[in-house]
Amino acid sequence: MTANAARLPTNPSNTNLLLRDGKLLALCEGGPPAVLDPLTLATLKSSDTYGVASFFAAHPRVDPADGTLIGCGLSLGATSLESALASIEAGLSPASLLPSFPAPLNFFEWRRGAPRPQRQRAHTLPFFTFVHDLALTPTRALVVLPPYVIPDVGAYASAILGQRAVGMCFEWRPELGTRVMVIERRTLELEALVRLPDPAPTCYHVINAFEERAEAEGTEGTEGTEGAEGGGDVLSLQICEQANGDRPMLEAQYMDIAQAAFVAELQCKAVEYRLRLPPKSPPPSTSSGGDGAGEPAVASCVERVELAASARPFELPDVHPSYVGRRARYAYTWCLADDESTFANALQRIELVEGGETSEVVTFGAGRAAGSPLFVPTDEGEDEGYVLTFVYDGARHETDLVILDAADLSGDTVATVALGQHLPPLFHGIWEDDVGTV
């Protein structure tokens, strides 16, 4: 235990991948990314040179319009002098680089082709929780903050002192409510903090987000325009909401993954929350250090809609990358083939509207289980592309890469690539046409 004192666990870097600045970054929200050579997978130097003054959450998002990446991560203090100096240069105040409780959430902007993020801003959280995913629109970034929290300094100190794992310090506190943090991309300022309706929903992943004009209560508007007089913009946030809302039951499965049962109630359904923002007002006065100290505007959740109610319980959805931040019709999901399954093992396409249609559930035969879907576009149409998945074959103890037609998911397989080996269950992957140009 003494060897672990004052030493945070290393980041597993096992959740997602990002190609940036000619490097492959392996991500998990528990720390900075591992940096790899994308051609050889050799580990390269520390990511401190990127100047991100925080951890690096697993799901930064890329704006399809210009390739700008927006990411976030908890800031537990600068990890090195080099990181601290780069962060101050990017706009953070020195005070925001010191440890605090709860840890602030740092947002950063990284333009395509730049060697590191250009802007950063840290914001105080209402409670100490880790952030896994982020949603993006043309003008905002949104993160969901479920009340799965480290409750106090004492619990946090026990992790720092090596007395127990960080994951063992969290408690489900539904009375705190689930919040959505809305960040204005132009300034990286906190625009609003919205509480979602009780009982507090919980999720790991978002599906998408988009903006609409706020004409009046209950009316549809035009995507991506300013709010009407008397009301601000309306943001639609679509999330993978855990079906039974029992976060402790879900987390208990990770304690012994070999015996885990991710049954239907622990999987997700697609839910859209419509958030009404107040009319635009002059930005609050903040210090030049960029510590995100301004008070957020008062905003509200005006509607909750369950989408594609007939969809199979699912996780790890994917959409056409050109539709990130704007209204998408389809998502491709990793779902349970039937109610007897204890792990997601099939694929489905769902329509992201109330009462939306769903495709047939795509299965791959007895003893074969699909992994999460990855959409690879061939054109701008939402279903113009391929869906890739790794399929494990229990009889052969090997994994195949299976390629499906996104427009006809349950039709004939486009191609199957036998890998000749077993791949363990995976989370997320990426596709890049030319690794050398990123």
State where each predicted segment sits.
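Beta-propeller domains
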Residues: 1-217, 229-438
